[in-house]
């Protein structure tokens, strides 16, 4: 199966992505993660105003196959969460890089994502799995 790897995103080896626009980060999970999870049935996300710390858990995603922790690629404060996904978590599967985003975060340091995986590095990791 062929997956999409947007070039303007950075990736964690745990399959979360981050896209930075100024000081705002959009966070979600990759198309590969969606494929591996299968049918998504539950999503737990932090509240607006909650603090995230890079590398630490910020929520949970549950599918018919597994329950996975979600890891933050950035440190900052949640300014928006995708409420539509709380009620209909299966929508993540339809458009993980677009309408299936999880959180928008005001980041403390936009440069901290520089050591996250590039699209090419992430692709190499996924194709090696």
UniProtKB/Swiss-Prot annotation:
One of its GO terms (cellular component) is cytosol. The modification N6-lipoyllysine is found at residue 65. Its cofactor is (R)-lipoate. Keywords: Lipoyl. GO terms for biological process: glycine decarboxylation via glycine cleavage system. Binds 1 lipoyl cofactor covalently. Gene3D superfamilies: 2.40.50.100. InterPro entries: 2-oxoA_DH_lipoyl-BS, Biotin_lipoyl, GCV_H, GCV_H/Fam206, GCV_H_sub, Single_hybrid_motif. It comes from the Bacteria. Belongs to the GcvH family. The glycine cleavage system catalyzes the degradation of glycine. The H protein shuttles the methylamine group of glycine from the P protein to the T protein. This is Glycine cleavage system H protein. It comes from Nostoc punctiforme (strain ATCC 29133 / PCC 73102). The gene is gcvH.
């Amino acid at each position: 199966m062929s997956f999409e790897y947007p070039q303007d995103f950075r990736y964690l080896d745990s399959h979360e992505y981050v896209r930075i626009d100024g000081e705002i980060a959009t966070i979600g999970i990759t198309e590969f993660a969606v494929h591996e999870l299968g049918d998504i049935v539950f999503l737990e996300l932090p509240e607006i105003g909650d603090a995230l710390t890079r590398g630490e858990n910020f929520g949970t995603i549950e599918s018919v196959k597994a329950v996975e922790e979600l890891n933050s690629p950035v440190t900052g404060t949640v300014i928006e969460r995708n409420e539509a996904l709380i009620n209909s978590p299966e929508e993540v599967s339809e458009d993980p890089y677009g309408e299936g985003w999880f959180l928008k975060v005001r980041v403390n340091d936009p440069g901290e994502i520089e050591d996250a995986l590039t699209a090419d590095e992430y692709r190499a990791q996924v194709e090696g799995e």
